[in-house]
Structure formats: structure tokens, C-alpha cells
């Protein structure tokens, strides 16, 4: 059996393998209204990670006995396309995809005003087109933008980024090698204007001091992403006004 050797993640010059500084994020691109048949849609790119999200609803729930009398039902599906990774993925839903669908649904339920739409259903679909770490957060943000594109009332947009530990150094917005070989990975998503956490998970080990520093790093990154999200919405509506 071939033993894979852990690569150095932080080089002698203090930079990461992809040339970024420890507190530097990958380039971000957001586009709304990319699917004409969905009520709302968005593509969210963070480096080489690329996710498309589509929203349908609120619409009448079928069968009706599954409807809730006081709120909308939120159905969420996170799926990685077979061509999203280096090795072709089995198209059947994996345990990880089912788990992440639940994690993302719970985060979205904290921001959508589901109580405004009793006896209805809102469907959210996310397809990972390219995966290079951070797919849960990019999918969550793509879904948040697609919901905004659909005009569904929310308490706030969701912005998120992961902070990890690579060769003992805290790094912002992990790439695939850092995700695979690093000592810790902490995805954080927030509703920034409300200063509320929508998602926080920690895999690996951090000291209490590192955890506090990681949270501060994440908050700075989230503020940058949040501004880009708002700008993407403004751009979309500026285009609609011109039409």
C-alpha cells in the first residue's frame, strides 16, 4: 500500500502552496439569475470551488398532509456532480451529501422568514460543479444568494469562510491540500448585520487562544464576502432597472 507523504503547507517565505498569505482569501465571483426556469438562482465561486444553486417556491406542498400550518417547509439538496473532483464521483447521494444537506438546511432556516409562508414548500438545490475545499460554505452562500434572487424574505444574507491550521499557522479560506493535510478546519458562517452565527464546526485541534484568533480571522473574511454579496445584488437590480 502506497503511503502518501504530507506536503509542506507553509513555505519558507511564509506563503502558502498557492502563493497566498495566511490571512488572504481566494478570488470570489458571484452571479445571480443564471437559470431562467428557477424562481431564484446563483453561481458562487471561491477560487476553484464553484457551486450553482436554484430555488423553487414558495409553492403549495404536495402531498398536502406534509405541509405545516404555521410555516414553510424547507427542502434542501446538496449534491456533488460526478465531474466535480479529480476522481469521478458516484452520482448516488453519499452519506456526506445527506449530512451536509441537513447542515445547510438548518443554517438557512435561521435566516429565512419561513413563518410568512404557511402550508408551502421552498426547494433549494445546490450542485457542486468544481470542488477545491470549502464546498459546504460556498454551497450555503450560493443558496443564500439564490434565495435573495427569488425575493424570499430573509433576516440577512449568509456569508462564511473556513479558518484552518496548516503547519501550526492559522490560515484563512483553506484549499484542498490544507483541508486534507492541515491540523484543523473550522467553517464559520454568519448573518453579519445581525452579528449572529449560522454555522460553526471544528474538525481537528485548536487551543482556546487559536480558536479566538481563528474566529477573528473568519469575521474579517466574512465582512469582505458580505460586501461582495451585497454588491452582486445591487448589480443585478441595476441591470434590471436599465432594461
From Swiss-Prot:
Originating organism: Sulfurisphaera tokodaii (strain DSM 16993 / JCM 10545 / NBRC 100140 / 7)
EC number: 3.1.13.-
Annotated localization: Cytoplasm
Assembly and oligomerization: Component of the archaeal exosome complex. Forms a hexameric ring-like arrangement composed of 3 Rrp41-Rrp42 heterodimers. The hexameric ring associates with a trimer of Rrp4 and/or Csl4 subunits.
Gene Ontology molecular function terms on file: 3'-5'-RNA exonuclease activity; RNA binding
Enzyme class per UniProt: hydrolase
Single GO BP term: gene expression
Protein name in UniProt: Exosome complex component Rrp41
Keywords, alphabetical: Cytoplasm, Exonuclease, Exosome, Hydrolase, Nuclease
SUPFAM superfamilies: Ribonuclease PH domain 2-like, Ribosomal protein S5 domain 2-like
Recorded GO CC terms: cytoplasmic exosome (RNase complex)
Entry similarity comment: Belongs to the RNase PH family. Rrp41 subfamily.
Keyword match Cytoplasm: yes
Domain of life where this protein originates: Archaea
Function description: Catalytic component of the exosome, which is a complex involved in RNA degradation. Has 3'->5' exoribonuclease activity. Can also synthesize heteromeric RNA-tails.
The keyword Zinc-finger is annotated on this UniProt entry: no
Coiled-coil blocks: none
